[in-house]
Structure formats: structure tokens, C-alpha cells
Curated annotation (Swiss-Prot):
Pfam hit, one: Lys
Protein's name in the database: Lysozyme X
Organism: Drosophila melanogaster
Record GO biological process: defense response to Gram-negative bacterium; killing of cells of another organism
Functional description taken from the UniProt entry: Unlikely to play an active role in the humoral immune defense. May have a function in the digestion of bacteria in the food. May be involved in the clearance of bacteria from the larval gut before metamorphosis.
């Protein structure tokens, strides 16, 4: 029983161990290198700050509909990624939710751009924090 408890605890903390914590500049530079428009980078930095504190390995607590949000941009598993549990997902980004928890943010960025294209910035519940002040990113490229 004790071994089972240890395995369960390990399974719960594994995504946090696999992820990394970025900052506004490391995120802005990586996204710019991936071709994301520079005029959007402050907005993405704001979303990442408020959704995950720039942490890539975060799985959010269950939402009221039972879904969870994954990764640096907290992408929802009911609509955008396939959870490892096998529960139904529309999987609009055609990606596993676990792929959104790794150090490599390419899958997260691709999926977030798709969400933005279909739902706009208001797809993120924290967007209201970003509609006024945006974190500066110009100093990230000096």
C-alpha cells in the first residue's frame, strides 16, 4: 500500500518536474524565434504570467465542467488537447495534453495560436488582466 501511495505521489508531481519556469523575456525570444508576430509578444507574456506564472508543467485544477487546463498557456483539454486519461476531447490542436507540459513550448505555442485564431484573446479567462497594462518586451531584444 505504501508503494502504491509513493507511485501516486510521484505521478502527481511528475509534470512539474518535467516543466520549466520561463520569464517574460525567455518566452518572448522563443516565440519570436518561432515566427510569432512581435506585436503579440507582450500579450502572450501577460497571458503566460497570469495563467501559469510562466511555468510549462502546470496542470490547472478541474474546471466546473470537469475539464483541465495544461501548460504555460493553460490550454483546455475538452476542446484543444487529448488528455492521457482517454476522456473525450474535441482535440482541436491534434496534440496530447502531455505535450503541452514539456520544456519545449512549440506545441503549446502552435495550439495557443490556433485558439487565438478561433476564439480571440478572450479565450483566456485572465485576458481582462492584460487588456490594459502589458508587460514590456522591447528590453528582451537589446
Amino acid at each position: 500500500m505504501r508503494a502504491l501511495l509513493g507511485i501516486c505521489v510521484l505521478a502527481l508531481v511528475t509534470p512539474a518536474v518535467l516543466g520549466r519556469t520561463m520569464d517574460r523575456c525567455s518566452l518572448a525570444r522563443e516565440m519570436a524565434n518561432m515566427g510569432v508576430s512581435r506585436d503579440q509578444l507582450s500579450k502572450w507574456a501577460c497571458i503566460a504570467e497570469h495563467e501559469s506564472s510562466y511555468r510549462t508543467g502546470v496542470v490547472g485544477p478541474p474546471n466546473t465542467d470537469g475539464s483541465n487546463d495544461y501548460g504555460i498557456f493553460q490550454i483546455n483539454d475538452m476542446y484543444w488537447c487529448q488528455p492521457s486519461s482517454g476522456k473525450f476531447s474535441h482535440n482541436g490542436c491534434d496534440v496530447s495534453c502531455n505535450a503541452l507540459l514539456t520544456d519545449d513550448i512549440k506545441s503549446s505555442v502552435r495550439c495557443a495560436l490556433k485558439v487565438l485564431g478561433q476564439q480571440g484573446w478572450s479565450a483566456w479567462s485572465t485576458w481582462h488582466y492584460c487588456s490594459g497594462y502589458l508587460p514590456p518586451i522591447d528590453d528582451c531584444f537589446v
